């Protein structure tokens, strides 16, 4: 009793302290519970992370040719932004989100969060269907945790035919944009839940066990030995997309022989390339274009359907008696001659050549997503849940580039064997089906002993650069892509340990020199004086496509380029600046090309119909606009700076480490990226500062650069619209300048392909609300950076928001002329202007001779090259 009384007395005396302690314990428990929930959620959403998972030992060097990466994310929650640095083979540099402002102006009002775009809204769970609409109507920044670009729902009242319970399927339904796609997803899921979609077991006919991988050796002397029977004839299946017609012609020129056959499928979205390929095929009886076209997305089931349909076509073309089927893309190129390839295949005319993933089947199944159900619609590959691999068979796979015998192709296309029929059903709902279907059919068929674990190619894999989840906007998975070959990779092209006859990838916009080296190695040099060997042109716009394929930024830039060029012609010294050389543009440009020389971007070539100011017929001119460099390296002379370059642009390709938006044309609604390239040296921490045209410090952040770091890049989440005009990005160390560059946010003369209206200009060209680009204010850095007083610049910026019509065009032209210069003009047809050279006689025009990419007649030896 005494002890009880003491306890009660103590409780009464310290009841306030006890209550406080209990409250603190309760609060801590809630916090721990909350964070544990977050960790569990993140564990299931690893695909959202920007940084790729650590590679297994040897994975970076093993050439498995499989492009699957790891599980992607369907995007449950928007993640915080983070910076990245890249440096292959060494620990990456860290980008630190460090607020370097010294004070915050109390008068500034923090902006509301930017609205979520239709393609990036979080529509899973309770938020489904509650799309936020932005007042300005422009998209926000991409979210690392979402399937960027995946279409979003337009009809949230869709009701499936069964109760769908899987989180992957529910997420796909919430994100699909069309009712047809939602219906397809629901039908597939309902059939799968009922157990009637996937085969439970598949018959296996192969009597062998283990991997069928007979080694085949090859040396150059075998090409000279007599063949067993007549030389084989090859059906080349070329699967192409994009706009690189000149590189495709160069490939065709290298592999062409009159004894072979060429069947070309052009992606349904590549109309310009299709027109060019159809014209190309008219000159050769053994070159045909598929009369049908499909949209073949990366990882999609459509690619396998395209191959199977093409195989049927090739089997049924009268007179095309081919022995082998070889698929190629426009980024492939031969590494040995046609004679060597024919000799090799003639000695192995009963073999099928496919590259396998290796020995660890269970790991391959997980990595490839074969145990997941996928469906393709709305040009997206949706992950819908888990599934079981059919019993009774060995699942294999690796590369979707192969060399197959005609007999095996006939078996796959025409057989009613349950093995093929049921595997077709299984692979209809499979990610990357072409990387596994033919392997699995062959390895379980009676022809399993014909499999050779070699697809006769060498692929330039660098998984630390190529596995960046770059396809998550079209597939709910993380995938990999091989790197482009460069001259330093040439030794890899000379494989001696195994027979290889093709290599990939090559891109002339990235590096053309390696193609020159390889072409010389195979066929010798072109005659002395051959033009354009170091030049490359690629079309970016053609009038036949219409302006719908152009962004407002590109439409603004191309029309401004034409005006600048015509103004240059009219104001130049005689003989250019005569009345006969004064023109007015007629309509929109008819075509635009990228121009490269010696693997350096040289600018845009704009073809424009014009009307002479003097009396005369209409003419067509081509104009060359060249970018002007604005980089300043400002490191102290007594301290060698590691900084090599500082660039700002959009469409950064982390795999090839370049901006795909050549020339850096960007507008108020774009999301620019700052990229720094470094030489090796001591660790350093640098500060990056972005300054807008009115001297507003838009953002500042620190980057830590390790000793071996080569590239750092970061896209700050700036509020938009960005203020048009010249921006400055400074790089400092201890507030001492290392480098500085300028870039242009282009004032738009078009909005939604129509001339800009005043009510649109008033917000589109005004910068972000309250001049706040970030939640933090960095204006306190103005004095440290010695920025000018902003009043005059602010007044000019305010006037610019009211401009439309010719006044707006004049402002756009002035700004553009500070970053671009007219490098040349030429006439496509006859012109009275005495100083206009015919385009065909120039070295830079897209109409000038380009022998390396011109096909011409078949030579006496049956070849084009």
Curated annotation (Swiss-Prot):
Residues 37-865 are lumenal. It catalyses: UDP-alpha-D-xylose + L-seryl-[protein] = 3-O-(beta-D-xylosyl)-L-seryl-[protein] + UDP + H(+). Pathway: Glycan metabolism; chondroitin sulfate biosynthesis; Glycan metabolism; heparan sulfate biosynthesis. Its EC number is 2.4.2.26. It is a single-pass type II membrane protein. Keywords: Disease variant, Disulfide bond, Glycoprotein, Glycosyltransferase, Golgi apparatus, Magnesium, Manganese, Membrane, Metal-binding, Secreted, Signal-anchor, Transferase, Transmembrane, Transmembrane helix. Its main location: Golgi. Residues 53-65 have a biased composition (Basic and acidic residues). UDP-alpha-D-xylose binds at residues 239, 267, 296-298, 400-401, 481, 504-505. It is linked to Spondyloocular syndrome: A syndrome characterized by cataract, loss of vision due to retinal detachment, facial dysmorphism, facial hypotonia, normal height with disproportional short trunk, osteoporosis, immobile spine with thoracic kyphosis and reduced lumbal lordosis. Monomer. This is Xylosyltransferase 2. It comes from Homo sapiens. The lineage of its organism: Eukaryota, Metazoa, Chordata, Craniata, Vertebrata. The gene is XYLT2.
